[in-house]
C-alpha cells in the first residue's frame, strides 16, 4: 500500500533509508515501476576503525546478492553520514573497501559510498542540505549548473570531482 500511496501523490520512487527492505516490497516496487535505492542500516557502526568493515560487509554482500535482480533498485548506498566518532576520523579505507566490493558484486548500478559525507570513492556525490530558505538553497547549487563547482560544507574532508550530484536529505 505504501508504494501505491506514494505513486498516487506523484512520487516515482524512494530512498529506502537505513534499512534492508523485504523482498515482498521490492517485488511490488518492480511490478509497479517504483524506483528505489538499496541501503544498509549502519547506525552505531563506528567507521573510525579498520575492523568496521567486518560489521557491514557480510550482510551488505548478502543484500546485494539477494536483491541484484530487482529492476526497481537503481543504486546502492552502504553507509549514511559517516561522521567522525568521539574525535576519531572515519577510516577511509573501510569505505573504499565496501565501495569496491559493491562495484565488484554489481558493476551495473551506481554506488554512493556514504550518503552525505565524508566521500572517499563514489559514483554519485550525495549531499545533505537542510537549508530551508529557497533562495539560499538555490545559491548552493547555481555554480554546479554554471561552473561545475559544488557548494560543500565539508570541502575540507572530501573533494567533488564532477560526479553526478544527489541532494538526498
Regions found by a protein language model. Give the residues of each.
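Glycine-rich phosphate-binding "P-loop"
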Residues: 1
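Substrate-binding/catalytic cleft of secreted carbohydrate-active enzymes
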Residues: 5, 13-169
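Metal- or metallocofactor-binding catalytic centers and their adjacent structured scaffolds
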Residues: 9
Amino acid at each position: 500500500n505504501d508504494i501505491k500511496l506514494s505513486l498516487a501523490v506523484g512520487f516515482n520512487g524512494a530512498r529506502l533509508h537505513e534499512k534492508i527492505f523485504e523482498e515482498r516490497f521490492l517485488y511490488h516496487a518492480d511490478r509497479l515501476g517504483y524506483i528505489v535505492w538499496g541501503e544498509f542500516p549502519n547506525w552505531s557502526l563506528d567507521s573510525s576503525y579498520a575492523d568496521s568493515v567486518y560489521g557491514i560487509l557480510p550482510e551488505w554482500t548478502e543484500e546485494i546478492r539477494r536483491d541484484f535482480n530487482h529492476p526497481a533498485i537503481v543504486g546502492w548506498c552502504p553507509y549514511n553520514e559517516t561522521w567522525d566518532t568521539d574525535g576519531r576520523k572515519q577510516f577511509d579505507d573501510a569505505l573504499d573497501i565496501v565501495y569496491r566490493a559493491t562495484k565488484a558484486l554489481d558493476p551495473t548500478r551506481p554506488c554512493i559510498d556514504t550518503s552525505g559525507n565524508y566521500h572517499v570513492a563514489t559514483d554519485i556525490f550525495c549531499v545533505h542540505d537542510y537549508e530551508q530558505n529557497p533562495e539560499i538553497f538555490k545559491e548552493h547549487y547555481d555554480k554546479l549548473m554554471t561552473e561545475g563547482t559544488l557548494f560543500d560544507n565539508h570541502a575540507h574532508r572530501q573533494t567533488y570531482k564532477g560526479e553526478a550530484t544527489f541532494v538526498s536529505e
